[in-house]
């Protein structure tokens, strides 16, 4: 799709994320706003809006990708909990936000903000975070 950052990549994706790698049926993206260290997005490989738009097999593989990403986040960053968000009314591409939460830290026991615009990293810090995640995939 023409205006979809997940589909087009490049500058559209760079506004909010950095591609880490491809998984079985999705791409793993580091969310640039890192108020929750280790926050990522798992975006389905094709431009579909809903889970019901893909086959049972593809849906199962998509959730395997979500679980793979969650395991990597748990090992790399040791959150107390990972929150999962699937919204998409602003951009209809099937994706999940995986948001590590840390007890007694930012937004613990509350719903996470989509983009609090509080924490951005240097290019070197993003690269380190990406390598840390990749090491545990």
Model-derived regions: residue spans:
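HIT superfamily nucleotide-processing domains
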Residues: 1-137
């Amino acid at each position: 799709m023409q205006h979809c950052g997940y589909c087009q990549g490049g500058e559209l994706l760079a506004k909010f994320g950095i591609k880490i790698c491809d998984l079985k049926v999705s791409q793993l993206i580091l969310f640039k706003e890192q108020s929750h260290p280790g926050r990522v997005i798992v975006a389905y490989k094709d431009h579909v809006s809903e889970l019901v738009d893909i086959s049972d097999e593809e849906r199962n593989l998509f959730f395997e990708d979500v679980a793979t990403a969650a395991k990597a986040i748990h090992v790399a960053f040791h959150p107390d909990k990972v929150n999962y968000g699937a919204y998409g009314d602003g951009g209809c591409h099937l994706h999940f936000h995986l948001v590590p939460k840390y007890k007694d830290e930012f937004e613990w026991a509350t719903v996470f903000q989509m983009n609090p615009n509080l924490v951005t990293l240097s290019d070197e810090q993003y690269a380190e975070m990406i390598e840390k995640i990749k090491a545990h995939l």
